[in-house]
């Protein structure tokens, strides 16, 4: 019986270590991507771990605050291009208080103006970190294309 228990514990340890390797690999890939991405024309850094590229400029002069409710389209992908969530594919923009979004989205979208479309590159520390989410492995860099349609104060 003692041997079965030891085998069981060993298997659990091996499985838990492989998950840590994936998490560490994701983190290293995220950091490498962000470092290299800054050399691309049109990519700017808001702060360490948060980059954007302007796809379309609205020019309204109106930006949301954290308390505002925004109406926006989001298309979220991982580094491998797989889509983890898309309001566009769902056929309906997201209407949400800006403060309810992940920190990277909060910071970037608060700088956008109504009518803008930006591509955001968000380090795991400003997203879901080591916790991950269904469809989002731990320590994953998130890429969002965001179109800010309106602000409801």
Predicted features by range, described:
Residues 5, 17-153:
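Cross-family detector of peptidyl-prolyl cis-trans isomerase
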């Amino acid at each position: 019986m003692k041997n079965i228990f030891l085998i069981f514990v060993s298997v659990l340890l091996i499985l838990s270590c492989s998950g840590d390797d994936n998490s560490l690999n994701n983190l290293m890939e995220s950091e490498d991507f962000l470092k290299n991405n800054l050399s691309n024309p049109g990519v700017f850094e808001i702060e360490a771990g948060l980059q954007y590229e302007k796809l379309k400029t609205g020019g309204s002069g109106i930006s949301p605050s954290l308390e505002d409710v925004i109406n926006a389209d989001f298309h979220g992908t991982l580094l491998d291009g797989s889509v983890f969530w898309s309001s566009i594919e769902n056929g309906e923009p997201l209407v949400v208080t800006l403060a309810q979004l992940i920190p990277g989205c909060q910071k970037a979208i608060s700088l956008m103006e109504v009518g803008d479309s930006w591509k955001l590159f968000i380090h795991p520390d400003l997203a879901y970190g080591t916790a991950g989410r269904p469809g989002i492995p731990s320590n994953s860099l998130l890429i969002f294309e965001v179109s800010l349609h309106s602000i409801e104060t």
